[in-house]
């Protein structure tokens, strides 16, 4: 889990989850630990902000063991590259997440809806 700090100083805890319907909302990249041998065996793209999530989905599709620890492992301040409010940047994030996370790992085209919904929520909720 990860403690998220908003710009106004308030916090909330974002819980990590494993569900049948995968979404980046359930994964907390700052709290992910991966064995070096997996990085060597499955090198990932490393060219965009969603490539680590693509790696996570690849590990899941390869039936690698994923463990969720019910404990806060990091504190995180919101407002990074994935939250930049720019329509062009949002369209690129939608395209990249869909292409390099979901489609490359064999997920349904329906995941485009999830990608659009995430970016729309960022614009609306801040």
Residue ranges and their predicted role:
Residues 1-87:
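Conserved nucleotide-sugar donor-binding catalytic segment
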